[in-house]
Amino acid sequence: MAITIPNREEILADWEAHPMRKPRIEKVTINIGVGESGERLTKAEIMLERLTGQKPIRRKAKKTNRDFGIRRGEPIAVKVTLRGPKAYEMLKRLLAAVDNRLKASSFDEHGNVCFGIDEHINIPGVEYDPEIGIFGMDVCVTLERPGFRVARRKRKRAKIPTRHKLTKEEGMVYMMEEFGVEIVEEEG
């Protein structure tokens, strides 16, 4: 069942009156956790590069886990970070893979959203390649307001005031308005 945000009209009116308060996409991070190094990790890297047109980086294990046969420092995942118009276009394709539906629990308290894709072949425009196989992936969308640079810059760095931080509801409204996403409650 789709969720309705009670103060949606207030949020939209605020963005209309104050354009600098309207959120935007800072980055889209796509991660494929393979759990092992070797041929399967290389195939995931090739697939992610074909999908995004950008060279992915390898992520290393932080701890040794004997049960999974993982050593500390061993590459076990690949990820790519997209920014700007490239991130926007890729997010449209990735949301189509999940039927433009997101769970309310996928949003954190700062309006960011993460969701998973079970099989990469569900993404529009992606063909199945038997040499590579099928991979699932995690997609994290980081939202920000204009002016968040003051927290990241080197000189004259400042904290973002609470009134300028994004809320969970604003993140939901942004995804609904910008991408036509339907936000659903938990099933079960």
Swiss-Prot record:
Ribonucleoprotein recorded as keyword: yes
A GO BP annotation: translation
UniProt keyword Cell inner membrane present: no
Pfam families assigned to the protein according to its UniProt record, in alphabetical order: Ribosomal_L5 (PF00281), Ribosomal_L5_C (PF00673)
Keyword line: Ribonucleoprotein, Ribosomal protein, RNA-binding, rRNA-binding, tRNA-binding
GO cellular component, one term: ribonucleoprotein complex
Family: Belongs to the universal ribosomal protein uL5 family.
Cited function: This is one of the proteins that bind and probably mediate the attachment of the 5S RNA into the large ribosomal subunit, where it forms part of the central protuberance. In the 70S ribosome it contacts protein S13 of the 30S subunit (bridge B1b), connecting the 2 subunits; this bridge is implicated in subunit movement. May contact the P site tRNA; the 5S rRNA and some of its associated proteins might help stabilize positioning of ribosome-bound tRNAs.
Matches recorded under PANTHER family: 60S RIBOSOMAL PROTEIN L11-RELATED
Name assigned to this protein: Large ribosomal subunit protein uL5
